[in-house]
From Swiss-Prot:
InterPro entries: ATP-cone_dom, NrdR-like_N, RNR_NrdR-like. GO terms for molecular function: ATP binding; DNA binding; zinc ion binding. Keywords: ATP-binding, DNA-binding, Metal-binding, Nucleotide-binding, Repressor, Transcription, Transcription regulation, Zinc, Zinc-finger. HAMAP family: NrdR. Belongs to the NrdR family. It comes from Aromatoleum aromaticum (strain DSM 19018 / LMG 30748 / EbN1). Pfam families: ATP-cone (PF03477), Zn_ribbon_NrdR (PF22811). This is Transcriptional repressor NrdR. GO terms for biological process: negative regulation of DNA-templated transcription. The keyword Metal-binding applies. Residues 148-171 are annotated as: Disordered. Binds 1 zinc ion.
Length: 171
């Protein structure tokens, strides 16, 4: 790989590490000509499907846009960045598993709502209110009733205390 500092094409790998899941390989490289070090990342390049918007326009799938919209819904909620990243990964895996070249934006929105409902009910309601474009307060109240009617599974009496500096509510 070419050195980003001096342009020499003969760099050497000094260290190689995989992340926990094995999806990304991190390499520390050294240039023998200028003796500078730099880091590269190697990951599988999967072709995500294009997104077909409601108006018929098509756009490339954007990981950052998906994560950003979910992060906005989760703002000031006690959900860690790790939990958000895992949810985004699950959505991307489901989109890839469809095996389609194009996916309607409605499908992506439904997957996001499903993941947000698992992570945090308030974030789910926030996202649903924008995504479904509620016409009036009654539609909003109906979603709240739906969420409240679901049985609560192993829920602690009080919300958990933040355990990480990465808690989204601190941003």
């Amino acid at each position: 790989m070419k050195c980003p500092f001096c342009g020499d094409p003969n760099t050497q790998v000094a260290d190689t590490r995989e992340n926990e899941g094995g999806e990304v390989v991190r390499r520390r490289r050294r240039c023998p000509k200028c003796d500078k070090r730099f880091t590269t990342y190697e990951r599988i390049d999967l072709k995500m499907p294009h997104i077909v918007k409601r108006n018929g326009n098509r756009s490339e799938f954007e990981h950052d846009k998906l994560a950003g919209s979910m992060k906005l819904a989760l703002r000031k909620r006690p959900v860690t960045l790790e939990a958000l990243d895992a949810a985004v990964d699950r959505i991307e895996a489901k989109l890839l598993a469809l095996g389609e070249q194009e996916v309607p934006s409605e499908k992506v929105g439904e997957l996001v709502m499903r993941e947000l409902k698992k992570l945090d009910k308030v974030a789910y309601i926030r996202f649903a209110s924008v995504y479904r474009n509620f016409a009036d307060v009654d539609e909003f109240a109906e979603v709240i009733r739906e969420v409240k009617a679901r049985p609560k599974r192993n829920r602690p009496a009080e919300p958990p205390e933040p355990t990480s500096e990465n808690d989204l509510f601190r941003s």
